[in-house]
């Protein structure tokens, strides 16, 4: 009966006697056992001092246990886990209706994203020729809807049409029929992205970047066009460089093949549209937008190889007729570009250097410190902006993989130095390939690439160059999602010399929830970290589609006050207010 004993006598009278306690020796006894009870009380009083000592020991043990409560000690990244149903308690039973008639899952229409994704399949390319009508839910429906002349006139009065496009009724002009999101976020240039002096002094391009025609579209293995069995039926097209008249890149144009790995037609479309959005002065950009882009998009949507190649040839002819000096003068004046331009440019480099040998990145032990994973460009752009990474800053990536984060920080933010350290041999080899291709492509597009440095096939632990640069870093990236406790301790030791104001990006909190200031860690830099948790959006990392969480820790001059509040320490990652109870 939970610490109590039930005793029955011959008279069927029942008595309840409490088990001996450290703090209480109360009991209920019968008159018959009065003498026996008196002896028990005397014995209890004689051991009172011993019981008091035991009580203090137990209390100390409980305090120590609470100090290392698992709630405060460690926590899984909650964002990557499935949320519980908070509406009602799950009894584990499946409703009969749901058991007999399973729920219907709606099919998503990915047709409008076929161009913006470089890994689209052929079945997503074609679309009906019917006019598009925007539904209330924001999706595009292909159906014919009669519109009266009065409705057209009213619409014109409410919203003026774009100049030169007033009388066009073709669905080609809609934003959903473009390769690039024309309404996407823009990137304010913090430094001169284009190297004007280089462009003015070099009219001939002498680099040899990897050609698109050497890549497979449905296999990560490299090959040449002549190695395919059906090369005779493949149509090819050459795309004119917008800055160097002597350079043209050859592409395979084949809408019948799978483009699961690489889509050359989509890449052509993006490059032509970026010519309009970034490189060309206004008069030429409008001409390209009105004359060539509609036919280019329509031929892609209809899988019209002949029309697509014809649009490319018209583009090439137009580019050759534009004075090169006009383009250079325009590039000198621009102060913002589409953010996707940097992402797509880096993807072109990635497909040439990393894709053909991507299988090498799978050579690692599962769930170890050496697991390979990538942070995707959109997330990097967001977090660089949050950290206010800017021109002249020093950026470091501890565990840089193939160097994606390093080169994006260099191009997007204009860092004075972008540094990466990688220990794995295969990833280090691919880093060199990607960096060499990046340098060639930057020259081809007239882009400035600031100082980039790698420490390859070396650990960042006991690394002299890392130790030398840590005090200079403004932003440090540590993808510690699968770091074990031992490596996290070494990272803590490495970061001790970080300067005030340095921001550290991580996928798990650098400072354990059990961390406390004591006599032995008074000088630890973790005492001065202001740790902020953020929600990670979907499609931010390569190993999962789901969202999650990430942290930005800022090195402060003074001690973080939350370390002195147990309540604040407990809710540091929960974001809940303090609740006081009796």
Curated annotation (Swiss-Prot):
Residue span, DOT1 domain: 254-568
GO CC annotation, single: nucleosome
Result of knocking out the encoding gene: Leads to sensitivity to UV irradiation.
Any matching Pfam family: DOT1
Binding site for S-adenosyl-L-methionine: 372-375, 395-404, 422, 459-460
GO terms for biological process, alphabetical: DNA damage checkpoint signaling; DNA repair; global genome nucleotide-excision repair; meiotic recombination checkpoint signaling; methylation; mitotic G1 DNA damage checkpoint signaling; mitotic intra-S DNA damage checkpoint signaling; negative regulation of heterochromatin formation
Phenotype for residue 543 to A: Abolishes methyltransferase activity, but not S-adenosyl-L-methionine binding
Annotated phenotype, changing residue 350 to F: Reduces methyltransferase activity
UniProt pH dependence: Optimum pH is 8 to 9.
Biased composition (Polar residues): 1-30, 39-50
Summary of activators and inhibitors of this protein: Ubiquitination of histone H2B by the RAD6/UBC2-BRE1 complex to form H2BK123ub1 is required for efficient DOT1 methyltransferase activity on histone H3. Interaction with DNA is required for optimal histone methyltransferase activity.
Keywords noted in UniProt: Chromatin regulator, DNA-binding, Methyltransferase, Nucleus, Phosphoprotein, Repeat, S-adenosyl-L-methionine, Transcription, Transcription regulation, Transferase
Bias-annotated ranges (Basic residues): 104-117, 124-146
Catalytic activity: L-lysyl(79)-[histone H3] + 3 S-adenosyl-L-methionine = N(6),N(6),N(6)-trimethyl-L-lysyl(79)-[histone H3] + 3 S-adenosyl-L-homocysteine + 3 H(+)
GO MF term list: DNA binding; histone binding; histone H3K79 methyltransferase activity; histone H3K79 trimethyltransferase activity
InterPro entries: Dot1, DOT1_dom, H3-K79_meTrfase, SAM-dependent_MTases_sf
Family of the protein in this entry: Belongs to the class I-like SAM-binding methyltransferase superfamily. DOT1 family.
Protein name listed in UniProt: Histone-lysine N-methyltransferase, H3 lysine-79 specific
Source organism of this protein record: Saccharomyces cerevisiae (strain ATCC 204508 / S288c)
């Amino acid at each position: 009966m939970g610490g109590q004993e039930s005793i029955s006598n011959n008279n069927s009278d029942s008595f309840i006697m409490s088990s001996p306690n450290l703090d209480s020796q109360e009991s209920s006894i019968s008159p018959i056992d009065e003498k026996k009870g008196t002896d028990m009380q005397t014995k209890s009083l004689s051991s009172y001092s011993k019981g008091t000592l035991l009580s203090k020991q137990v209390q100390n043990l409980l305090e120590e246990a609470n100090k290392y409560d698992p709630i405060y000690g460690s926590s899984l990244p909650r964002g990557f886990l499935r949320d519980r149903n908070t509406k009602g308690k799950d009894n584990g039973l499946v409703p009969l209706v749901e058991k007999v008639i399973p729920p219907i899952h709606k099919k998503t229409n990915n047709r409008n994203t076929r161009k913006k994704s470089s890994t689209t399949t052929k079945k997503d390319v074609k679309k009906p020729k019917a006019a598009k009508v925007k539904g209330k839910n924001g999706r595009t429906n292909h159906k014919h809807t009669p519109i009266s002349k009065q409705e057209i006139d009213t619409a014109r009065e409410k919203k003026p049409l774009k100049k030169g496009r007033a009388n066009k009724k073709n669905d080609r002009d809609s934003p959903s029929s473009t390769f690039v999101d024309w309404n996407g976020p823009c990137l304010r240039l913090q430094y001169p992205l284009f190297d004007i002096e280089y462009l003015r002094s070099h009219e001939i391009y002498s680099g040899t970047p990897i050609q698109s025609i050497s890549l497979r579209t449905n296999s990560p293995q490299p090959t040449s066009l002549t190695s395919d069995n059906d090369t005779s039926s493949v149509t090819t097209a050459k795309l004119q460089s917008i800055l160097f008249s002597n350079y043209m890149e050859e592409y395979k144009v084949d809408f019948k093949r799978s483009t699961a790995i690489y889509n050359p037609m989509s890449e052509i479309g993006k490059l032509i549209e970026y010519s309009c959005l970034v490189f060309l002065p206004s008069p030429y950009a409008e001409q390209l937008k009105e004359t060539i882009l509609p036919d280019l998009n329509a031929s892609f949507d209809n899988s019209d190889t002949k029309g697509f190649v014809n649009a490319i040839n018209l583009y090439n002819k137009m580019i050759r007729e534009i004075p090169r000096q006009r383009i250079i003068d325009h590039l000198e004046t621009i102060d913002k570009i589409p953010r996707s331009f940097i992402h797509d440019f880096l993807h072109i480099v990635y497909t040439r250097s990393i894709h053909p040998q991507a299988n090498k990145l799978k050579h690692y032990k599962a769930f170890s410190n050496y697991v390979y994973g990538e942070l995707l460009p959109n997330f990097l752009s967001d977090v660089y902006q949050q950290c206010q990474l800017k021109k002249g800053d020093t950026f470091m990536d501890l565990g840089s993989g193939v160097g994606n984060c390093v080169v994006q920080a260099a191009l997007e933010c204009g860092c004075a130095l972008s540094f990466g350290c990688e220990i794995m041999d295969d990833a280090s080899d691919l880093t060199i390939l990607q960096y060499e291709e990046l340098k060639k492509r930057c020259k081809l597009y007239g882009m400035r690439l600031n100082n980039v440095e790698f420490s390859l096939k070396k650990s960042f632990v006991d690394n002299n160059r890392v130790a030398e640069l840590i005090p200079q870093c403004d932003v440090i990236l540590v993808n510690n999602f699968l770091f074990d406790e031992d490596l996290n301790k070494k990272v803590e030791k490495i970061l001790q010399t970080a300067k005030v104001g340095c921001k550290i990006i991580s996928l798990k909190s650098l400072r354990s929830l059990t961390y406390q200031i004591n006599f032995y860690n008074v000088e630890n830099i973790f005492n001065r970290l202001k740790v902020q948790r953020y929600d990670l959006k979907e499609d931010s990392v390569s190993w999962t589609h789901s969202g999650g969480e990430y942290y930005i820790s800022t090195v402060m001059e003074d001690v973080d006050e939350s370390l002195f509040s147990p309540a604040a320490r407990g809710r540091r990652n929960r974001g809940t207010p303090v609740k006081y109870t009796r």
